[in-house]
Structure formats: C-alpha cells, structure tokens
C-alpha cells in the first residue's frame, strides 16, 4: 500500500533534499520547475547549473549570468528562455571563456560588435567564427595580429569577397587552408591560391582542400581529375559540383577510395553507378546505397549483394520513396533474415507499419522495439497475440508518454 504524505511532510522532505545538496535528487526537483529561487543561491556550482538549465524565469537567468562557472554559462545560453538582455550580461562576464561562449552562440550583432573588441584574442576568435558577425567586423578582424583570428575570418561564409581577397596574401599557411575550405571563396581566388609558394607537403594539403571546394572552374575540375596524386583525385571525386562526365572517368580509377567517392556523389549518373555495381565490391555497393540520387532501377542489383548493412542503408536512404521499397518487402516477405534486419534498423513509418503485421513473432518483437515505429502502430500491437510483443509495445508507449510529460513540463 502506498504511503500518503501531507503537504507539510512533503515540504519537509524536499527541504531535507535541498539541504543534502544531492545533485541527482535536486535535478529532479529543478526539472519540474520547483524551488529555483532557493536552489540558485546554493554554494554548489553544479546545483546552480541545474537551475540555469531548467528555469524559465528571465530574472533568475540574469542573476546567474554574472556567475563565472562555465557550465552555468553554457546552460544559460542553451536555455530557450535566454534573452539578448541575458546575453549582454554574459558578454561582460569576468570569465573570458564565458564571453567566448556568448561570442560563439549569439546572433545579436550589437553583442558581436562589442565582443569583437574584447581584450582576450580567443574571444575575438569566436566572434570571427560566428556567421552572424557583420562583414565590416570580420574585415576589421582580418587584420588581427593573431593568425588564429584571421584563420576564422577566412573560414567564415559571411566574410565579404574583398576581405577574402586580402587574406589571399596572408603569410600563414593555415589562413590559406581556411580560404580553400570556405564555400564563399570565388573561383578567381581559388585559382590564385594554386599559385602560392609553400613546402611540397603543405602545397599538397592546400590542393586537396581546393579540390573539395564547390567553386572550382571547369579547368581545375579537369586538372584534379587527371592528377597523378590519388589524394587529389579522391578529393575532387567528392566535390558536390563535379560534372557527371568526370565522375564517369574517375569511376574507372585504380584506387578504391576514389571509386567510393564517385559511388556516393549525388552527381554520378545511373549508368556510372550501374558500372560500379559490376565490381560486386561490398564497400562500393555500400557507398552506392548511401547515394542521395540512387535510381530505383538499381535496387534489385544492390539487394543481390546480400549484405545486412547495405540492405538497412538502402531502406534508410531518405531519397528513395516508400513506393520503391514496399514492393521489395512484399517480394521478400518470407526471407526472415532480410525482413528482421529491416525491422530492426528501418526508420520509415510505412515500412514498419507493414512489418508490424508479419507472421513472425520475432519480426513483430523487433518492430515494437524500434524507436521509429509510429505510436498508432504500437497501440495496435498492444493487442498482439504474442505476450512479448504486447509487453514491448506497452513499455515503448509508457516511455514515450513519460518523455512527452517531461517535454510539456519544460515548455511550461
């Protein structure tokens, strides 16, 4: 029989928990939204951090924003109730690591302008990294004495082209590497980067990064695709803008890693993918199964590879419509190993709904245990003829209900 407590007894029990300063117990209290004002005064920084994570009171967040503990700062910034006013207080925190967290997370341009003048360079580094930082601030930071700050400016997709052009003449190799990585770096800058004088090893690394940049000219695409250096061919084969005709050439490369990049590149046409499948190589087939533009016509060939990982990868490829996969389920309904594998790893509602009606109890057990199985399907499975299926379905539904209640409590 459950013992009942009076309100006074419950109050005493909670007060004793607070006094014991047990973080696990206090986390439960704080998560429910209780006693935040009292808990935030604790001398234990872990308990104050718990309040910073769960409170919906902006006044409490403002008070905690002066705390120098980095975990408290992170929890405040991750709290959905954190306002720009709270961020402004954090931006003046005496702990530079707290200020750098603000610089990394905020989207407020006034705060970013303020932190761009911070006395600690690693705070400025985070400002340079933030894509919400205004271009004029990034331009100013591109002249910073620390190459680490200039490197972040060179990486930032919000950096203006004329600023990127200036950084082309930077003496530090790391800044040039960052320029090569930036998806906003123009074709013209990339071509001039190729002319930079560096050590042989550094030049190779720079060229690899350039080969992956989507803004390559047609000439550079051809140059990298024909390079005697396999790492350059491997890099350009992964480029999201490489033309299909060059991928067709690279599909015949003698290096397996080059062909694998061709196999999973979205620009590779059906004919080239079909050619690669003829290799009957497990790794190549796995890469094809991940291709976002995998043609449905190739599915029968892929399934013939008969490897569990490939099967589940295909069924989780979000670009393949359900209508392309449901016939496969129907055709291989009696292949228990295949069906069991799909039931265990699939994240598709339509597939799991179909498999919930499978004759095999082991398949239905796996479906009921799959976190992607729709709630409506689990509700039906509560009445399954198999005790184990019913038990798992009930447990899943209970866990989801608990999770929903916790989410609702946080939103309140």
What are the roles of these predicted feature ranges?
Residues 2-412:
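Alpha-helical scaffold segments
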């Amino acid at each position: 029989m459950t013992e009942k407590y009076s309100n006074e007894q419950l109050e005493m029990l909670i007060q004793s928990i607070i006094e014991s300063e047990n973080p696990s117990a206090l986390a439960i209290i704080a998560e429910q939204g209780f006693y935040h004002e009292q808990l935030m005064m604790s001398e234990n920084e872990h308990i104050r951090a718990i309040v910073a994570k769960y409170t919906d009171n902006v006044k409490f967040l403002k008070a905690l924003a002066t705390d120098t503990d980095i975990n408290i700062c992170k929890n405040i910034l991750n709290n959905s109730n954190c306002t720009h006013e709270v961020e402004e207080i954090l931006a003046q925190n005496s702990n530079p690591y707290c200020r750098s967290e603000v610089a990394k997370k905020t989207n407020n341009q006034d705060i970013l302008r303020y932190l761009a003048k911070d006395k600690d360079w690693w705070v400025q580094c985070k400002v340079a990294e933030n894509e919400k930082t205004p271009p004029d601030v990034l331009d100013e930071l591109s002249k910073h004495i620390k190459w680490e700050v200039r490197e972040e400016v060179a990486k930032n997709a919000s950096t203006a082209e004329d600023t990127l052009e200036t950084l082309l003449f930077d003496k530090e190799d790391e800044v040039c590497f960052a320029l090569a990585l930036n998806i906003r770096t123009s074709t013209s800058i990339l071509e001039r980067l190729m002319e930079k004088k560096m050590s042989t090893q550094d030049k190779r690394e720079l060229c690899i990064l350039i080969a992956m940049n989507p803004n390559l000219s047609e000439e550079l695409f051809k140059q990298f695709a024909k390079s005697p250096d396999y790492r350059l061919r491997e890099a350009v084969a992964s480029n999201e803008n490489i033309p299909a005709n060059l991928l067709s050439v690279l599909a015949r490369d003698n290096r397996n890693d080059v062909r694998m990049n061709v196999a999973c590149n979205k620009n590779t046409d059906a004919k080239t993918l079909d050619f690669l499948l003829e290799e009957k190589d497990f790794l190549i087939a796995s890469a094809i199964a991940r291709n976002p533009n995998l043609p449905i016509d190739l599915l029968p060939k892929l399934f013939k590879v008969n490897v569990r990982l490939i099967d589940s990868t295909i069924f989780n490829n979000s670009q393949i419509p359900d209508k392309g996969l449901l016939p496969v389920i129907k055709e291989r309904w009696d292949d228990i190993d295949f069906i069991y594998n799909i039931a265990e790893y699939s994240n598709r509602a339509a597939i799991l709904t179909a498999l919930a009606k499978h004759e095999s109890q082991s398949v239905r057990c796996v479906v009921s245990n799959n976190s992607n199985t729709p709630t409506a399907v689990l509700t039906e499975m509560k009445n399954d003829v198999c005790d184990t299926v019913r038990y798992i379905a009930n447990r899943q539904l209970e866990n989801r209900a608990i999770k929903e209640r916790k989410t609702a409590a946080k939103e309140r």
